């Protein structure tokens, strides 16, 4: 048995649900299907369970089930379906919450499981979907016909691998690999190991995966054409960083296999400088919040650099309940009061404006080094907190050198 096979033998144990878990998922899914069918009696619709819970590609401990209401009559609005279902579940005492994607859907809470009940329209292969959810029945059919039992096990293994390295999930928080994309990769390449072998050779903007002879053009680091919709790139959410992280992890696992790629150990925090800007969590959907604070983080990153602070890395973290924070790992949190500022070459027409500007200010210079003019001038901000406060309004807290999260730790899975 090879070293890779020995590690996978142990890793398979981590992704194999117990018979009790499988029984419970099937039981809860069947019960909710019956409830929904009863609530929508007389409506031209098919009610079924799709997604990973229906294909046995879910990870142990996962508490999510997807039930779809596939509407055959396009005059029926998803909003009306949701309203009918909400009244029914109020009547039988099942707790629920209203969620939104392109249209509303319900999340039920049944015996510790979160069951999403999603209306969609019935479409034929190749037909343009009305909503993104309309593709789900076709996705289920495509994968159910192609994935063997061993491949379904390998899908679970690949999901855990991606989750452990931090790139599992297509939501804005992660910008990584969706569950559907993970299943397509195993279906396309054949096995977990074959996916990693192929990914080791992927190159951004030059990797194009299609089950057909599709010639549709996409501009993205990774392209995986949806086999049921050739105009859609299933990998559109995968960022350059997430793709590159997966390529590195694939190469290193094949070179030096370890269970750490499936169960990362705890890594100690190092004493590097870090500043954390902490905001109260707003009452909005996670995708909206993550998108907003990633944009704010990028803007603040540029501002900090303009202030003279060297940023090693940065990121956004949140518990999606009480706080969202932007963290910057920096070289220094305090800068010296003066900085060398480079001007134009003395042979450039802009030199006169540079000299006249700094003759009116308190500086050292202007002086010439080589062909350029320079001055030594006072910084506007020397403290990183002052620089941040100049950019932002109120409603946040600044914590300096109190952060101990993943951005200041050794990568725990890498071997």
UniProtKB/Swiss-Prot annotation:
Gene3D superfamilies from the UniProt entry: Beta Polymerase, domain 2 (3.30.460.10), CCA tRNA nucleotidyltransferase, domain 2 (1.10.1410.30), Poly(A) polymerase predicted RNA binding domain (3.30.70.590)
GO molecular function, a single term: magnesium ion binding
Membrane in keyword set: no
Keyword Metal-binding set for record: yes
CDD domains: NT_2-5OAS_ClassI-CCAase
Binding site for Mg(2+): 64, 66, 116
Reaction(s) this enzyme catalyzes, per UniProt: a tRNA precursor + 2 CTP + ATP = a tRNA with a 3' CCA end + 3 diphosphate; a tRNA with a 3' CCA end + 2 CTP + ATP = a tRNA with a 3' CCACCA end + 3 diphosphate
Enzyme class per UniProt: transferase
GO term, biological process aspect, one: tRNA 3'-terminal CCA addition
Cofactor(s) named in the record: Mg(2+)
E.C. numbers: 2.7.7.72
Residues engaged in binding CTP: 52, 55, 139, 159, 168
Keywords: ATP-binding, Magnesium, Metal-binding, Nucleotide-binding, Nucleotidyltransferase, RNA repair, RNA-binding, Transferase, tRNA processing
Binding-site positions, ATP: 52, 55, 139, 159, 168
Alphabetized HAMAP family for the sequence: CCA_arch
Similarity remark: Belongs to the tRNA nucleotidyltransferase/poly(A) polymerase family. Archaeal CCA-adding enzyme subfamily.
Function text: Catalyzes the addition and repair of the essential 3'-terminal CCA sequence in tRNAs without using a nucleic acid template. Adds these three nucleotides in the order of C, C, and A to the tRNA nucleotide-73, using CTP and ATP as substrates and producing inorganic pyrophosphate. tRNA 3'-terminal CCA addition is required both for tRNA processing and repair. Also involved in tRNA surveillance by mediating tandem CCA addition to generate a CCACCA at the 3' terminus of unstable tRNAs. While stable tRNAs receive only 3'-terminal CCA, unstable tRNAs are marked with CCACCA and rapidly degraded.
Note, other: A single active site specifically recognizes both ATP and CTP and is responsible for their addition.
Complex and partners: Homodimer.
PANTHER family reported for this sequence: CCA-ADDING ENZYME
Protein name: CCA-adding enzyme
């Amino acid at each position: 048995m090879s070293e890779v096979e020995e590690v996978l033998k142990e890793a398979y144990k981590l992704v194999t649900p117990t018979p009790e878990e499988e029984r419970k998922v099937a039981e809860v899914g069947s019960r909710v299907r019956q409830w929904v069918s009863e609530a929508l009696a007389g409506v031209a619709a098919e009610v079924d369970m799709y997604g990973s819970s229906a294909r046995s590609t879910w990870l142990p401990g996962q508490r999510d089930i997807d039930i779809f209401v596939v509407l055959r009559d396009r005059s029926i609005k998803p909003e009306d379906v949701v309203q009918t279902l909400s009244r029914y579940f109020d009547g039988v005492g099942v707790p629920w919450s209203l969620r939104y994607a392109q249209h509303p859907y319900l999340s039920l809470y049944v015996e510790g499981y979160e069951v999403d009940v999603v209306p969609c329209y019935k479409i034929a292969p190749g037909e343009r979907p009305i909503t993104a959810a309309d593709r789900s029945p076709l996705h289920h059919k495509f994968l159910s016909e192609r994935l063997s039992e061993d491949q379904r096990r390998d899908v679970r293994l690949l999901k855990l691998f991606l989750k452990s390295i931090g790139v599992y999930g297509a939501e804005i928080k992660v910008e990584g690999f969706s569950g559907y994309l993970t299943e397509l990769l195993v279906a396309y390449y054949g096995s977990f190991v074959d996916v990693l072998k192929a990914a080791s050779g992927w190159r951004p903007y030059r990797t194009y995966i299609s089950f057909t002879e599709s010639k549709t053009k996409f501009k993205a680091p990774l392209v995986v054409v949806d086999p049921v919709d050739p105009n859609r790139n299933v990998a559109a959410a995968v960022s350059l960083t997430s793709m590159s992280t997966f390529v590195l992890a694939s190469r290193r696992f094949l070179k030096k296999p370890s269970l750490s790629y499936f169960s990362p150990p705890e890594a100690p925090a190092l004493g590097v400088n870090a500043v954390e800007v902490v905001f109260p969590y707003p009452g909005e959907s996670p995708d909206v919040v993550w998108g907003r604070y990633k944009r704010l983080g990028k803007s603040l990153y540029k501002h900090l650099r303009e202030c003279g602070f060297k940023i090693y890395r940065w990121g956004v973290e949140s518990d999606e309940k009480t706080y969202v924070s932007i963290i910057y790992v920096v070289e220094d949190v305090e800068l010296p009061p003066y900085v060398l500022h480079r001007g134009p070459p003395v042979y450039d027409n802009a030199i006169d404006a540079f000299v006249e500007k700094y003759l009116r200010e308190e500086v050292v210079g202007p002086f010439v080094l080589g062909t350029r003019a320079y001055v030594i001038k006072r910084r506007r901000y020397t403290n990183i907190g002052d620089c941040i406060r100049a950019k932002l309004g109120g409603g946040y807290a600044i914590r300096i050198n109190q952060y101990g999260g993943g951005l200041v730790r050794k990568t725990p899975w890498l071997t």
